Amino acid sequence: GVPCLCDSDGPSVRGNTLSGIIWLAGCPSGWHNCKKHGPTIGWCCKQ
């Protein structure tokens, strides 16, 4: 999947670990949405 920035990773992509994965159809079972706002397409989820 495509990595994305969770709210817990920090304010910006620069210098932070991207611990989330973008899912287009919502987070799969056992995962949770880790970003309150965005990304524009899909959900940023993490296990």
UniProtKB/Swiss-Prot annotation:
<dbReference type="GO" id="GO:0090729">
    <property type="term" value="F:toxin activity"/>
</dbReference>
<keyword id="KW-1015">Disulfide bond</keyword>
<dbReference type="InterPro" id="IPR000693">
    <property type="entry name" value="Anenome_toxin"/>
</dbReference>
<dbReference type="GO" id="GO:0042151">
    <property type="term" value="C:nematocyst"/>
</dbReference>
<protein>
    <recommendedName>
        <fullName>Delta-actitoxin-Avd1c</fullName>
    </recommendedName>
</protein>
<dbReference type="GO" id="GO:0005576">
    <property type="term" value="C:extracellular region"/>
</dbReference>
<keyword id="KW-0738">Voltage-gated sodium channel impairing toxin</keyword>
<dbReference type="GO" id="GO:0017080">
    <property type="term" value="F:sodium channel regulator activity"/>
</dbReference>
<keyword id="KW-0964">Secreted</keyword>
<dbReference type="Pfam" id="PF00706">
    <property type="entry name" value="Toxin_4"/>
</dbReference>
<dbReference type="InterPro" id="IPR023355">
    <property type="entry name" value="Myo_ane_neurotoxin_sf"/>
</dbReference>
<feature type="disulfide bond">
    <location>
        <begin position="27"/>
        <end position="45"/>
    </location>
</feature>
<keyword id="KW-0872">Ion channel impairing toxin</keyword>
<feature type="disulfide bond">
    <location>
        <begin position="6"/>
        <end position="34"/>
    </location>
</feature>
<comment type="similarity">
    <text>Belongs to the sea anemone sodium channel inhibitory toxin family. Type I subfamily.</text>
</comment>
<keyword id="KW-0800">Toxin</keyword>
<keyword id="KW-0528">Neurotoxin</keyword>
<feature type="disulfide bond">
    <location>
        <begin position="4"/>
        <end position="44"/>
    </location>
</feature>
<keyword id="KW-0166">Nematocyst</keyword>
<comment type="function">
    <text>Binds specifically to voltage-gated sodium channels (Nav) (site 3), thereby delaying their inactivation. Has a strong effect on crustaceans and insects (DmNav1) and a weaker effect on mammals. This toxin is highly potent at mammalian Nav1.1/SCN1A (EC(50)=6.01 nM) and Nav1.2/SCN2A (EC(50)=7.88 nM). It also has great activity on Nav1.5/SCN5A (EC(50)=49.05 nM), Nav1.4/SCN4A (EC(50)=109.49 nM) and Nav1.6/SCN8A (EC(50)=about 180 nM) and is less potent on Nav1.3/SCN3A (EC(50)=759.22 nM) (when measured as the increase in the slow component).</text>
</comment>
<dbReference type="GO" id="GO:0009966">
    <property type="term" value="P:regulation of signal transduction"/>
</dbReference>
